[in-house]
Amino acid sequence: MKQAKKEIGHREFVFLMALLMSMTALSIDAMLPALGQIGQSLNVQNPNDTQMVISAVFLGMAGGLLLYGPLSDSYGRKNSLYLGIGIFLVGIIISIYSTNFSFMLMGRLLQGFGSASARVVTVALIRDRFEGSEMGRMMSLILAVFIMVPAMAPSIGQGILYVADWRAIFWFIFALGIFGGLWLNIRQPETLTAENRRSFTFSIIYSGIKETLKNPISRTYAIISGIIFGAFIGYLSSAQQI
């Protein structure tokens, strides 16, 4: 009989969750200094088109956010994270070896779709393990660590560009993805037991969206959040050129 893994300590859990959540931020913010170099390397005629390197990640992430919650409820938290990390890493490889801008954007879409798993499933992991005020405290600690990544990522990307080209930034993020996946596999036990899982159907996603949109409070918050997030994406995509 296979012995269950022991729960990891709070401090290690905080840093593991923060690392997994930071994959999206790294794949976006670390690439900002490299947009001009990417455009030149891939013969992008209009400099404004390089902004799609950023927006493609958000587009892919939008689709993934709808899928990984129900998947993790059916197949377990860790399996869903493995799937997302795998897609994320494949997207990075496509971007690294892309010879034209279309392949670059395809890779970026996959990176966004894959990294969405960490944004969704890490929250489910936290809810599985903690509740009440302790859950709020852990979320605060994880976000406090995570929030440092978007602030540091552009400097990391620029530092890499001083010694290598834009592909080295992708290799750096790829290495962190591998490290995060191995850390998750070795140290973090599965938090959703088999008896608490439910069958996956696309009707679950549809009914969830329908229920959210029917609720006026949820609908209002979603619209407001969308407007704010849209402005943020617009700024982030054009920040490097500005």
Each model region followed by its residue ranges:
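Juxtamembrane intracellular "pre-TM" segments in multi-pass secondary transporters
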Residues: 1-7, 191-222
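Extracytoplasmic
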Residues: 12-44, 235-240
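Cytoplasmic helix-loop-helix junction between adjacent transmembrane helices
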Residues: 107-148
